[in-house]
Swiss-Prot record:
GO molecular function, one term: heme binding
Family named by the database record: Belongs to the cytochrome c family.
The keyword Aminoacyl-tRNA synthetase belongs to this UniProt entry's keyword annotation: no
Protein name: Cytochrome c
Cell compartment(s), UniProt: Mitochondrion intermembrane space
Length: 111
């Protein structure tokens, strides 16, 4: 389904999605290590490319996007379209419902 916008979803389903699709590259807890991807603690309200000690692509640093429900909703559908040049090797979550569930989980998990 094209378009759509963020709607609160099911955080426990989002947690499962995170475990299977995201956790091999990202940690969420405060002080969590940067892995293949940056630690996601404090994700909401921060700018792209801003985690200390993580080597981002220039594209990511220069995107100047602030992460929130709506930017994540669009980004996670097709990361390389939203930030051309990102090194995130993830094809995206095509279903709105999956993105809603994941973002709902991330809002809690990254606080």
């Amino acid at each position: 389904a094209k378009g759509g916008s963020f709607e609160p979803g099911d955080a426990s389903k989002g947690a499962n999605l995170f475990k299977t699709r995201c956790a091999q590259c990202h940690s969420v807890e405060q002080g969590g290590a940067n892995k293949i991807g940056p630690n996601l603690h404090g994700l909401f309200g921060r700018k792209t490319g801003s985690v200390e000690g993580y080597s981002y692509t220039d594209a990511n640093k220069q995107a100047g996007i602030t992460w929130n429900e709506d930017t994540l909703f669009e980004y996670l559908e097709n990361p390389k379209k939203f930030i051309p040049g990102t090194k995130m090797a993830f094809g995206g979550l095509k279903k709105n419902k999956d993105r809603n569930d994941l973002i709902t989980y991330l809002k809690e998990a990254t606080k």
